[in-house]
Amino acid sequence: MANYTAADVKRLRELTGSGMMACKNALADADGDFDKAVEQLRIKGAKDVGKRAERTTAEGLVVAKDGVMIEINCETDFVAKNDEFIKLADEIVTVAAAGKPADLDALKALELDGKTIDTVIAEQSAKIGEKLELSRVASFDGPVAVYLHKRSSDLPPAVGVLIEYTGEGDAAAEAARGAAMQVAALKAKYVTRDEVPAEIVASERHIAEETARAEGKPEQALPKIIEGRVNGFFKDVVLTEQSSVTDSKKTVKAILDEAGVTIKRFVRFEVGASA
């Protein structure tokens, strides 16, 4: 008896882009363990693993002010570019910038015109005729850099990056904003490789090894091949190890070092994408 369901097969197909039989076989080989099945399909060369999971399903905008960034969602792009919706987002982020909420619940509890933001959202939702939802908030101290990106000229920003850094002067501010643009474009997840969880590195190393073996690489060449592929993974997900989008001859770290900037932390919001 199969230890997986048709829903598991459907989900695996949507996530990996693999064929039905490949997904069934992967689930069977993994004894129904979904994560192991995904890993097996990656090793076998399945394309776009994880990328489909990032597809956005909601509309809305990202807005930032004075070290605070929020994402507020709606159902359609028609509402996303509605003046009242944009005004509401601006009013909420202004309150958030003053209150510096630690999390989403704290943001919703702040007051705007004598009402909690949660209540204001509900009232505006009824007025506009679509479900509105505050989905994320980030609040940083110290010097910050912000970059907001529009997917379309007629829509408000749908991608936002907030970076907290140390450094002084215009050169430092410019370098930090460049790093924010970098995160918006290439979706780094960590500042340095030391921040990457050990289990993720181990998984990537395992995938690199199994893929190399499946490709028939000579045994004596495996250590170098594995190390190269793991380093490639780090360049994909670690901000300071990426080649700069503004100067491909330099790493982001080199540009930041030249400006005397150290990135403390960052967050990237994309409308509709999971946190």
From Swiss-Prot:
Residue segments, region Involved in Mg(2+) ion dislocation from EF-Tu: 76-79
Protein's cellular compartments: Cytoplasm
Domain of life: Bacteria
Pfam families recorded: EF_TS (PF00889)
PROSITE patterns, A to Z: EF_TS_1, EF_TS_2
GO cellular component: cytoplasm
Keywords of this entry: Cytoplasm, Elongation factor, Protein biosynthesis
CDD domains: UBA_EF-Ts (cd14275)
Disulfide bond residue pairs: none
SUPFAM superfamilies assigned to the protein according to its UniProt record, in alphabetical order: Elongation factor Ts (EF-Ts), dimerisation domain, UBA-like
GO MF term list: translation elongation factor activity
Similarity comment: Belongs to the EF-Ts family.
Function: Associates with the EF-Tu.GDP complex and induces the exchange of GDP to GTP. It remains bound to the aminoacyl-tRNA.EF-Tu.GTP complex up to the GTP hydrolysis stage on the ribosome.
UniProt protein name: Elongation factor Ts
Organism expressing this protein natively: Rhodococcus erythropolis (strain PR4 / NBRC 100887)
Lineage: Bacteria, Bacillati, Actinomycetota, Actinomycetes, Mycobacteriales
